[in-house]
């Protein structure tokens, strides 16, 4: 085991590559600057102009109709109770053909 006493333990050290130095902590100047920016932005929000709508008249009409149709769909769905909806669904299923039933096959007739 004495042959291994001269072996260097630890990470390899490469030539031309310096060790990464520890970064210094930023002082409170950064925090103070951020707080000032927040305060000034709050003051500017009150003085900003209102939002200018840049949509074309066709786009505005389309959005209005979409909203109207969505409200109609919501009112239509809200008009039926769950019980009524289940009854309608069962009635619909009764009218469908039954594809998955096993057909009766008789060899005698």
Swiss-Prot record:
Family label: Belongs to the FAM32 family.
**What keywords is this UniProt entry annotated with?**
Apoptosis, Cell cycle, Nucleus
The residue ranges flagged as biased composition, category Basic residues, are 21-30
Q: Protein name, please?
A: Protein FAM32A-like
Can you say where in the cell this protein is located?
Nucleus
Q: Which GO terms describe its cellular component?
A: nucleolus
Work out whether the entry's keyword set contains Nucleus.
yes
Q: What is its main location?
A: nucleus
Question: What exactly does this protein do?
Answer: May induce G2 arrest and apoptosis. May also increase cell sensitivity to apoptotic stimuli.
Q: Which residues form a coiled coil?
A: none
Q: What InterPro entries does this protein map onto?
A: FAM32A (IPR013865)
Give the GO biological process terms.
apoptotic process
Q: Which regions are flagged for Low complexity bias? A: 9-20
């Amino acid at each position: 085991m004495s042959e291994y006493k001269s072996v260097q333990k630890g990470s390899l050290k490469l030539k031309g590559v310096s060790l990464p130095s520890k970064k210094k902590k930023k002082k409170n100047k950064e925090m103070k600057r951020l707080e000032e920016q927040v305060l000034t932005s709050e003051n500017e929000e009150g003085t900003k102009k209102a939002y200018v709508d840049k949509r074309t008249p066709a786009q505005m009409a389309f959005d209005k109709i979409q909203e109207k149709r969505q409200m109609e769909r919501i009112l239509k769905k809200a008009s039926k109770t769950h019980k009524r909806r289940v009854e309608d669904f069962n009635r619909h299923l009764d009218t469908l053909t039954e594809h998955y039933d096993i057909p009766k096959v008789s060899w005698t007739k």
